């Protein structure tokens, strides 16, 4: 008979197995990353047990003497990194951050313009998720299929036509900067707020690359803190000072009771790391993405946007419909310790999420493990061996990845997937 303690040991063993698998894998999931040992230390601290409702200095609980200072430091570091007038670090996810901005700046029934999901928009921008929860009427940005981006001229005309309360940029399939500056004049004419969901590219923006939404005219920059930004899972809102009170009230008491204090501490540490190393990390992530795209293209894969040098972000996107089903290809690669995901492409029906045409790749985690352009040809070759040649390369991949076990772009190089055993 299995005892309750046996289950605790089983779960512990599974966590260790997971860490070992990740260490021996090429992880190309575009929405994930690895944190430094200092961030991990924060995540297992006593802060994970505590409550601190409200803002620093205005808590509803006692016992927040040190918690207040941690959050204040994290807020100030975030404002410095993003050159923002105001920062709220309490959202427990990127979707919660989005929803807080929706509640703070618009009402039920208001129109919002956003990317359609197959075009690259995140599900929280759609009626079935956070935007629908707020009761928005959703209008989609006109899309340029060839250039995989919003059609700026058509967008400006549509803004004047539908008069949205929020113009939302950003998405989860995100190769090139969005036309924020081009929207400003039309937004001012119709009284719209410009919101930028930087969840995927937040680390690139922090490093001074991709684009600078707050300088280009966005009122709000929001995102999750664990994709290209190598922090703990959570969300952040950066905005103009005039929106600060409404944003803070939308977060608490509006959407979040107690936020995750250990994640706030981890975010503060990760933000300090990005202030120190973010520029180098972001630049290398983009260089790796461009090189990997070039290598895959040379090997015969249909990598999108060759005419635009493939990408300006951490992402590489392939249409694999001419060689197989993306769902099957991603499973074959997973069996060979190459982890990525199938993805809808703009020409796919939104209901085909289980059987789309595309593969999405991200280079941020392998960059954090120390890879540079020279390794991208090997990564591309392993993908080809599995997908085109039908070979098993699991052992080769594991051996290859044994040289990349440390976290880079941090104050000390530590084991990327070391299991932090306490007992």
Curated annotation (Swiss-Prot):
Catalytic activity: 5,10-methylenetetrahydromethanopterin + glycine + H2O = 5,6,7,8-tetrahydromethanopterin + L-serine
Protein's UniProt name: Serine hydroxymethyltransferase
Pathway(s) of this molecule: Amino-acid biosynthesis; glycine biosynthesis; glycine from L-serine: step 1/1
Keywords linked to the UniProt accession: Amino-acid biosynthesis, Cytoplasm, One-carbon metabolism, Pyridoxal phosphate, Transferase
Enzyme class: transferase
Protein species of origin: Methanothermobacter marburgensis (strain ATCC BAA-927 / DSM 2133 / JCM 14651 / NBRC 100331 / OCM 82 / Marburg) (Methanobacterium thermoautotrophicum)
Cofactor: pyridoxal 5'-phosphate
Main location: cytoplasm
One GO CC term, this protein: cytoplasm
Family from the record: Belongs to the SHMT family.
Site description Plays an important role in substrate specificity, residues in chain: 226
One of the record's GO molecular function terms: glycine hydroxymethyltransferase activity
Binding site for (6S)-5,6,7,8-tetrahydrofolate: 121-123, 242
